[in-house]
């Protein structure tokens, strides 16, 4: 029995992402299966320690490395480094044994690797966290305001008599920071830029939507001289660029990227794409586009505000011609993944908003005068593209 288990462990240890290079869905399923296997092997005490001690201590230390400038400085070198060398990269003098203890936790958590005693090797993750052009979701997601909102969520829910949080001005985040998430962004240009880069990085991680949605039908059915795609709240233009990459022959000006002026500053897009400042709480100025596209926008808002956004868009649509495309999480009736469920609680904590179940999407769109044509899940089963049109 012992030898067969040892053989199995060796086999499992050889599996890596390259084995699933051509099958993204299989890779995601393998991750889920591996995580479930770990949980089956752990005792209740072990899982409790993991949740209360192991995971909860990693994020603060990631933030310490961020404060010391170590992620960026190490990534710029990108090679093996000694403890002393790492200390020399710090923007602030620190005790060597303190750094050793911090590194011990981060290597045990596989954030970077321990090559030998007091010698470390970067990983894809640690290099990623040091690349400021990508706006790491790890460092952004472990920022004090975010972590504080998660920590304060139990207190916030108790103080609000365990009612579902749906007021964007009252959230666990606002309880922590003294202002809402959006208010803080609007008052802090640096934080707004960091958040924009974070969203850009997050978007690039996701499966490109033209890879699983029939964008060819949009181009084929488009009228000459009319807009084909309006990307509303599209940040740096990752999604509209992906559309253009698949359909490079579309006419200049037929693709439009809309967002707040501060967000559009991050957009470095092809000259065929028109940049247009727009507040999606005001009427959509582009009339009769083939498609209007929202990616990770509506999950930021409760139903009342989301309905307001939709009702400002619907009048611009043409019946029988225009499509409304929403790329967001659509939580299944059963069997939600951990990332889907965690994102829902994250939206609750930060914004008093939500990730919507499929049935909630159906009700919301119907109230806006829309009917769902089809749900298009991405291969990772994280997000779903909801195709809708006027009733």
Swiss-Prot record:
Signal peptide: none
Entry EC no(s): 2.1.1.-
Pfam families found in the cross-reference section: Methyltransf_2
Gene Ontology biological process: methylation; secondary metabolite biosynthetic process
Active site: 299
Pathway: Mycotoxin biosynthesis
Keyword Methyltransferase assigned: yes
Keywords: Methyltransferase, S-adenosyl-L-methionine, Transferase
Disulfides per UniProt: none
Residues that bind S-adenosyl-L-methionine: 233-234, 259, 279-280
UniProt key word Calcium: no
UniProt-listed InterPro entries: COMT-like (IPR016461), O_MeTrfase_dom (IPR001077), SAM-dependent_MTases_sf (IPR029063), WH-like_DNA-bd_sf (IPR036388), WH_DNA-bd_sf (IPR036390)
Domain of life the protein comes from: Eukaryota
Single GO term (MF): O-methyltransferase activity
Gene3D superfamilies: Vaccinia Virus protein VP39, Winged helix-like DNA-binding domain superfamily/Winged helix DNA-binding domain
Reported function: O-methyltransferase; part of the core atranone cluster (CAC) which products are predicted to catalyze most or all steps of mycotoxin atranone synthesis, starting from geranylgeranyl pyrophosphate (GGPP). The initial cyclization of GGPP to dolabellane is probably performed by the terpene cyclase ATR13. The Baeyer-Villiger oxidation near the end of the atranone synthesis, which converts atranones D and E to atranones F and G is predicted to be catalyzed by the monooxygenase ATR8. Of the CAC's other predicted gene products, the reducing PKS ATR6 might synthesize a polyketide chain.
Family of the protein in this entry: Belongs to the class I-like SAM-binding methyltransferase superfamily. Cation-independent O-methyltransferase family. COMT subfamily.
Protein name: O-methyltransferase ATR12
Species the sequence originates in: Stachybotrys chlorohalonatus (strain IBT 40285)
């Amino acid at each position: 029995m012992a030898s067969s288990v040892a053989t199995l462990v060796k086999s499992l240890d050889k599996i890596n992402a390259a084995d699933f290079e051509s099958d993204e869905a299989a890779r995601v399923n393998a991750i889920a299966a591996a995580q479930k296997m770990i949980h089956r092997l752990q005792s209740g005490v072990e899982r409790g320690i993991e949740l209360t001690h192991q995971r909860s201590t990693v994020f603060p230390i990631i933030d310490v490395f961020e404060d010391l400038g170590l992620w960026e400085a190490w990534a710029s070198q990108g090679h093996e480094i000694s403890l002393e060398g790492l200390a020399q990269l710090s923007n602030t003098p620190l005790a060597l044994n303190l750094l050793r203890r911090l590194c011990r936790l981060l290597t045990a958590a596989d954030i970077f690797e321990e090559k030998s005693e007091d010698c470390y090797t970067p990983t894809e993750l640690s290099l990623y966290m040091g690349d400021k052009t990508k706006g790491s979701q790890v460092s952004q997601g472990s920022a004090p305001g975010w972590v504080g909102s998660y920590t304060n969520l139990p207190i916030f829910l108790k103080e609000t008599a365990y009612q579902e949080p749906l007021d964007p001005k009252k959230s666990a985040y606002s309880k922590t920071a003294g202002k809402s998430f959006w208010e803080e962004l609007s008052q802090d240009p640096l934080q707004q830029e960091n958040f924009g880069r974070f969203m850009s990085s997050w978007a690039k991680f996701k499966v490109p939507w033209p890879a699983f949605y029939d964008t060819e039908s949009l181009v084929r059915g488009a009228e000459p001289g009319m807009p084909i795609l309006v990307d509303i709240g599209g940040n740096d233009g990752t999604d509209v660029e992906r559309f253009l990459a698949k359909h490079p022959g579309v006419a200049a000006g037929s693709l439009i990227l809309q967002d707040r002026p501060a967000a559009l500053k991050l957009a470095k897009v092809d000259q065929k794409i028109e940049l247009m400042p727009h507040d999606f709480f005001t009427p959509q100025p582009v009339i009769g586009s083939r498609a209007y596209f929202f990616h990770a926008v509506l999950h930021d808002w409760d139903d009342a505000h989301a309905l307001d956004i939709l009702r400002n868009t619907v009048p611009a649509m043409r019946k029988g011609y225009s499509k409304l495309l929403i790329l967001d999480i659509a939580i299944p009736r059963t069997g939600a993944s951990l990332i889907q469920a965690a994102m829902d609680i994250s939206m609750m904590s930060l914004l008093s908003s939500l990730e919507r179940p499929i049935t909630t999407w159906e009700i919301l769109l119907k109230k806006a005068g829309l009917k769902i044509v089809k749900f298009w899940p991405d291969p990772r089963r994280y997000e779903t593209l909801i195709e809708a049109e006027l009733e």
